[in-house]
Every structure is written in structure tokens, then in C-alpha cells.
């Protein structure tokens, strides 16, 4: 029942629908009390020979009309009640998605995709079912049950009613006990379902790697274990679920037995008539549904409550990244970075320390360094993926923490290390951030990203479907489509996080040349790369090692000093020369 209190905000808002449904249920319950009463009266009249066959027909017609009216009214209350519950499903999923879209990187490191999908689908369905069928069964069982009890006790026999209800307290105690067991067992079953979702998602997204390494059997065994465990958990739920109906039917059977014995004694002593006893037995039959409904309601609500706890545990968490209140002036500004120390959550060792950078509009900053040195961490801080101290990063003399996140992210365009494309056309993937872009604009940025020629060679050109995660394109093509997508945003700051790793040196040179022409003193460029040739034209290059800047300057300055940059640059150049010599030798052969 706690769930209904937790959803009170929705019930209060949709009170008209729920009130309408409840009123219709009361009318239905009242109408359903008529047939047993009519049957009892008819039996007494027939026994007394005060009624003939033809006189019965109008009463039968009344019973038929009652059934038709009840059918129509049930249709109407279902529209009212389930219309409201479906609205709840929409709102919960939108709320869940909105919350996820506002979360930072750290949230998704702690919560797996499959589990989040399970909460947004299966758990929401359970909550909605409780808000629909749960409310229905609660109201229907209470209204019908109390109506029947009142008629039985006032119109027939109060004593017989008390005798017949002797098994009910025992049934109520057992149902409450099973309900508590069901809540905990169902919660474990949902956790197991989340694990199954996680495993399925991992297998489907990494199917190429699984096949490449011949891990099909290994992954199949792991999936089989998780599937069996999920089935086992659901079987435990089913076993508890299966206890409800037998308890109810045994209680009803025992109530009928007591009613027949007690009713027979009352008829023998002329305290009630045979017709009244018949009506009483029919009313007792009407009590089967309220009791079943009450047990079913406990079942539904306990499942819904367990599901709500799982949903609420996500959406009730405080956002790790809090939004600012200020808007940015509508023109490019200076990005000032002064990070003394940055620690990842629950990490004692600083990932960045003493990082001081000034990026003016139109400037290019190159970032390089060994793997794991902190380059991507710095870029994530610029994107506000993690929290930092108020004074550490400023834009337009405003701390990034004071700027509205949406406004800031509209000013930056990011191409990450891992290229991500949606299962859509190339055109729609490029125009993702600017849906109203013209075909001319799309083609212009594709040319800047040096991918236009590749696209027009495809059968359907820009309308080619790229498949799941861009599976129909090569790694280099995916990177270039992502670069085109970022360029179309025309953002003040363009960030390329090792976004040219899958293209050859000539293509890289073409793209950087086009980007340098595109930015023309209006846009800033931040580029991280392991291929140092991409940084030659940067206004400033910083070398990060173990989270600190160990060298800085432009390309000409850094190659004149004995340092990491110089040795790595000439090492890479020698590799390129060696590859060129090998290609030349192959041609001569």
C-alpha cells in the first residue's frame, strides 16, 4: 500500500479520471447485487406456487439488462482508469530519460546500460500495472465486498454472515505474509533481469570481437548461467504467487460449507427461507471476486512497490553535476584554465595538477603525451563531465560552474576517441545537432571533413543507412562523419579528442587544413592526438605526463629542445619514412 502513497502526486492530479472510475465501480457493484435478490424472490414465489412460467420472463429480462449495463459501464471505467495509468507510463519514462540525460560520466560508470534499460521498461510497466489494475482491484474488491456484506447481513441474516466469514481473518493473515515475501523475492528477480539485460547488451554490442576471438561458446555458457539464474529467481516468485489462489479458494469453499450448514439450520428453524438461502449462497459467490481481487491487488502492488523502489533509487539521486545560472555573452571569449589538483571520485591520487592554459578565440591548442597521462581527463573537465573547483576553469571571466550547462555545451562541439553513429542515414547523422540544416550545409561540412567523396560513392549517397553504431562504414569514415557533425554546429570551441586516429596522414592533413581555414579567428580548436604531425600548426602545444604539463610551446620551439616531444616526433617520422620505402620497394617489384 506504500506505493499508492508514493504515487499520490499522480492520483491527485488525475483525480477526475480516478473519481469517475470509482463512481462507475460503485454503480456496477450495486447493479450486481440485483440478480441474486431477484433469484431468491423468484424461488420463494415458485415454491409457494404464486408465480407461473410466463411471469418469470420479465424478471429474466431485467437480469439480462443488468448484465448489459454492467458490461457497458465496465468498458467506460476501463477507459478512464487505464487511460490514466498509460499517461503515468509516459511520464515516468520521460522523467527517467530526462534524469539520465542530465547525468555526468561518473553516473554511467557506476550504472550499467542493461540495468538502466530494465528499470525504464520492465520496472515502469510494473508500477503502471499497479496504478491501473492495482487501483481497480482495490476499489472493486472493497466496494463489491462491503456491498455484498451489507446486503447479506441486513437483508438475509447477520448471524449467517458472521458464521460464513470465520475463515476470512486467517486468509487475510496469510495473504499479508505472502505479500511481504513476494516483495523481496520479486526485487531479487528484477535485479537478476537487469543482469540478463546487461549480458545481452554486452554480447550484441561486442559480437564482432566475440567472433574474432572465437568466444561464441564461452559467451554462450555465461549467458546460459545468467539465464538459468533469472529463470530460477522468477520461479521463486511464481511459487509464492501460486500460494495466493489456493488460500482464497479454500477459504471460499470453507465459507460455503459453513453457509450451507448454518443456512440449513436456519431454514430448519424457519428463520430464513430457501430462497433467502439461495440468494445468500449466490452473494457468497459474488464474494469470490473481491477476495481474489484483494489477493491479486497485494500481489500487483508488492511487485509495483519493488519496481518503484528500483526506479526511485535512480531518479531520486542528486545530480552529480549541478547546473549554473548564468548565460554566456553571444560572442567568442577566452577560455582560462588554472587547475591546481583534480581527483577522480574515491581516488587518492590526483589525475591532474598544475594545469595552466589560456585559449583565445581563433587559437589552436595541441595536447599530447603518453597514454594515460590525463589528456582526456582535461577535455572532460572542459566539457563539465566532472566537478571541479569554482576558480579553476573560466570562460568570458565566468566560472564554468556558474554557467548554464546547456548554454555552455552549445558553445562547444566535441568529437571523441570512439566514433558513435546512430542507426540512421548519413545525412541525419551529420545534421544531428542541427536538424533543420539544408543539404548544401551538410555537404559543405562533409567536404571540410574530407568524407564527401566517400559518401557520393555509396549506392544511396547521403541517404545511405549506416547501421547499428555505423557498422556499414569504416573506422576512418565514421570519424570523418563525426567531425562533419561537429563542424555543422559552428561552435565557438571545437574539441578533437584523438579523432583522427583512424585516417591516413594525407587525409589528416586535408582535414586539419580545412578546419584551419574554417575557424578563421572565430573558432578555437583543442586537439589531442598521439600522431604529433597533427599538431604542427598549433599556436601552442602542451605535453602532459602523469597529469602535469612537462613541456609547452609551438612545434618549432619543442623540436629544438631535447625532450619527449622531439624524440617522439622524429620517431614517428622515421616510421612514416620506413613505410614509404617499403611501399616504393613493392611498386618496383
Swiss-Prot record:
Main location: membrane
Gene3D superfamilies referenced in this protein's UniProt entry, alphabetically: ABC transporter type 1, transmembrane domain, P-loop containing nucleotide triphosphate hydrolases
Membrane topology: Multi-pass membrane protein
GO CC annotation: plasma membrane
Major enzyme class: translocase
Domain ABC transporter stretches: 334-571
Cited InterPro entries: AAA+_ATPase, ABC1_TM_dom, ABC1_TM_sf, ABC_transporter-like_ATP-bd, ABC_transporter-like_CS, P-loop_NTPase, Type_1_exporter
PANTHER family recorded: ATP-BINDING CASSETTE SUB-FAMILY B MEMBER 10, MITOCHONDRIAL, ATP-DEPENDENT PERMEASE MDL1, MITOCHONDRIAL
Binding site for ATP: 369-376
Catalytic activity: ATP + H2O + xenobioticSide 1 = ADP + phosphate + xenobioticSide 2
Segments passing through the bilayer: 23-43, 53-73, 134-154, 155-175, 247-267, 280-300
Lineage top rank: taxon: Bacteria
Family affiliation: Belongs to the ABC transporter superfamily. Drug exporter-2 (TC 3.A.1.117) family.
Protein name: Multidrug resistance-like ATP-binding protein MdlA
Sample GO molecular function, one term: ATP binding
The enzyme's E.C. designation: 7.6.2.2
Source species taxonomy: Bacteria, Pseudomonadati, Pseudomonadota, Gammaproteobacteria, Enterobacterales
Record-linked CDD domains: ABC_6TM_TmrB_like (cd18541)
Subcellular location: Cell membrane
Organism field: Buchnera aphidicola subsp. Acyrthosiphon pisum (strain APS) (Acyrthosiphon pisum symbiotic bacterium)
Domain ABC transmembrane type-1: 18-303
Keywords: ATP-binding, Cell membrane, Membrane, Nucleotide-binding, Translocase, Transmembrane, Transmembrane helix, Transport
